[in-house]
A protein has these predicted regions:
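Bacterial N-terminal signal peptides that target proteins for export
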Residues: 1-7
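Bacterial N-terminal signal peptides
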Residues: 8-16
Length: 166
């Protein structure tokens, strides 16, 4: 059993699908994922939106020491901003347990969701290489996230991140 390291940092996730935010510049797109450069934080993130308008975002914190994965929906949820709950994430044969932080109100109107933080390189590797992520929140029903294309999107984000430092 592996553990997700959670720090409870406030991350400015989901700013409308990010494209409309002033500080985010579209960097590129690959296999259904958009890559954005955050001009303020000098980091990059990847984002995918499914047919039901659910949004998945992944990136690095401003200090680049920790990665995040956020999942947001327009569906009705009981998620409260800042509320933390236990979560387990299955990626291939690996289960990661930790804490998810809820977001509502400070993100795009009509969306709620949460994010996890991790500094485990295996977690990032599994996200890049697996096709599906199964999330088991403490209070809600389990759900799956399609990870198709994450490997190439994460590669593009790495290049984007390197360019932000230059």
């Amino acid at each position: 059993l592996k553990r997700i390291i959670t720090l409870g940092l406030a991350i400015g996730l989901l700013t409308s699908t990010v494209a409309s935010a002033d500080t985010f510049l579209r960097y590129g797109e690959v296999e259904g994922w958009k890559v954005f450069a955050d001009q303020d934080k000098k980091t990059c993130l990847i984002e995918a939106v499914d047919d039901a308008e659910n949004v998945v975002q992944m990136g690095l914190t401003e200090d680049r020491g920790v990665g995040y994965v956020g999942v947001f929906t327009k569906a009705e949820t009981d998620i409260k901003r800042g509320e933390k709950e236990a979560v387990a994430i299955l990626l291939g044969d690996n289960i990661y347990v930790g804490e998810a932080t809820g977001m509502k109100g400070n993100i795009t109107k009509g969306y709620s969701g949460g994010y996890v933080l991790s500094d485990d390189p295996q977690f990032a590797d599994d996200i890049a290489k697996q096709k599906v992520m199964v999330v088991f929140p403490e209070k809600e029903f389990a759900f799956t996230v399609d990870l198709t294309g994450t490997y190439k999107a994460m590669e593009m984000a790495r290049k984007c991140n390197e360019e932000q430092l230059g």
